[in-house]
Amino acid sequence: MDNLYKIQQKEIGFFRFRSGQTIASIGAQCCHWEAAYAADSVIFYLEDIDSSKFKKGQIEFAWNYYAILRGRPMTSSYKMIVGDERSTSLPENTFDKILIINSFHEFSFQAEMLADIKKKLKAGGILYIDEALPKREGQLHGICNLPMLTNEETIAIFEKNGFEYVNGIDFNYRQKVPVRKIFAFRIK
């Protein structure tokens, strides 16, 4: 797992977390990515809609595990929030950054959720979308069996809903074309 933490440094650098920031992760469920990304003195709001799998014990396990990998205690804190398919239940005008990791393609009500998310970001805040990319159009996700979004489809959905694409980082994992991407958007 030390190697995984080293690989994640590329992602951590892209997110540019800073001490004192307030970050939300929507669709957080097991919270292991958020724990890996936890910079010093960041406040995390961890949100999910499935309270049967979104458990404090899982978060505590992940937080402790990554503290061991980091070689020092976590100084970030977290709050658990249960939302629903149309609303995050997060506080408004609060977040420097919002993450959606490998779950945006699962949203049943994408437009409603993006409208809700726009209210949650502070002025100048960034929304990060981390998704696997299909090798071909119409490909289904290997875990949830839902359609994956192409790079172009993802950007189009966000632009249609009042966001602009700022930047992105591709992950090829020894493939010829990217198989995963983190997109960065801000409100237009």
List each language-model region with its residue ranges.
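A short SAM/SAH-binding and catalytic strip from SAM-dependent methyltransferases
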Residues: 95-110
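C-terminal lobe and adjacent flexible extensions of AdoMet/dcAdoMet transferase-like proteins
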Residues: 184-188
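Short glycine-centered segments of the SAM/dcSAM-binding site in methyltransferase folds
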Residues: 22, 43, 124-126
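A short acidic, Gly/Pro-enriched loop at the edge of an enzyme's catalytic core
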Residues: 86-98
